[in-house]
Amino acid sequence: VALRSAKLAKKNPREIAQIIVDHLPENDLVQSVEIAGPGFINIRLKPTALQSVVAAVRAEKGDFGKGEIPEGERKINLEYISANPTGPMHAGHGRWAALGDATARVMRHAGYDVYEEFYINDHGTQMDNFGESVAVRYQQLLGRDVEMPEACYAGAYVKDIAQAIIDEDGDKWLDADPTERMENFRERAYAYELAEQHRVTERFGTTFDCWFSERSLYEPDENGESAVDRSLAAMDEKGYIYVEDGATWFKSSAFGDEKDRVLIKANGEMTYFMSDVAYHYNKMERGFDHLINIWGADHHGYIARCEAMLAAWGWPGALEIMLGQLVNLFRDGEAVRMSKRTGEMITFEELIDEVGVDATRYLMLAKSSDQPIDFDIEVAKKKDASNPVYYVQYAHARICSILGKAASEADAAAAESGELSMDELAAKVIPADVDLAPLAHESELALMRKMDDFGPLVAQAARDRAAFRLTHYAQDLAALFHSFYTNCHVIGEEAALRDARPALGDAARIVL
């Protein structure tokens, strides 16, 4: 504060800092206030102020650090992953899954009302191409000499779907009408891939409030109008639709876009952007006040036109885009692009299979979404401090081991039964009225200070859409616990600390 005010006040920063210190009210929780360096103000709290954090964490447990809905924030729609249902999700989708899910969790903990949505891109020629791809593989597997068209999908998974159809229907479709066959295979292949997306995201611990089908945007409601119709009418009513050379255009340049955008081509075909327009209008129709989309950085060029459409309807600023950079996979420092099993791009699930859900989640959140991630598969599997995931997990496991050992000394039969949760074990070890006053070692104070930072950190991470800060925080908290464990005897200490130190460890476990 002093440094920022110096230029405006035309005073030396230390002089301003002294004025601030002289006017600070007395506070029983403050141990000392010092001016340091060019004008920093260091406020050191008394141990009793920090000790109350331990009691708060242990009392509130999973609710510790929760906030209330920030003023002005209401219902938020968070859309992420939204992978095409034409093939397996790749490792990059794993980053969007981790980022979207963590962002939603952090925002909810901070008090925001967040609704998670997966947009299913199930409309357009890509779906027909998918159906045709399966039809070609189906014929090839049954001995027909048929070439795969250039626009089709050639992955091994297409062959698997075709084989599943053969197992179910045999050669029933071999001489069927090509269009009928393609449409049948398209729907079956679509259902298969959509089910796979559900299964893999659920395995990853990511659940959506809604899986929204792009097709539904073109389906009429009880009044005979589709979301496409309604979104166009709303834009036209505002005067931002015009027809030129037979095509229907959106006057997006009126809102800062570099040029106007075609919504309906002269031949009557809807553009991909038309779906975007209808989809975002539909979101606002459903009562959302703020929209957050997580996109890959390659979609950067779509931001201006999408912001323009919300502004055209009278909702400027309602759309927020989080852009995510690429995931670069490595194995022992060497770039990896292909799966050993399939010879194709490594899928999201293959990554989970190899390193686990926890490691994948954590490492995908190791950096801000606007920075590329170098994900080393071998490092993610290591059981040492070089693996940040293991380092944090080891701190948690260490605490659980301490509580388990202490519980065994208190009630061996109950502790060894395996029926008690960690909260129940902790309750057996630590008295409800535990005296925390003896916690005064610098390692203990540092650990408590870090736990006290949790609530404000969650609020900041939610506000800035910066879930990655929580992985950094977990790393720091784990390091402070390891230091505390090294410098302070947790079990077998004198009576004054026998209960207090396990209580501190238990609080660190809950926050971790």
Predicted regions and their residues:
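Non-catalytic interaction-recognition regions
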Residues: V1-Q51, R58-L512
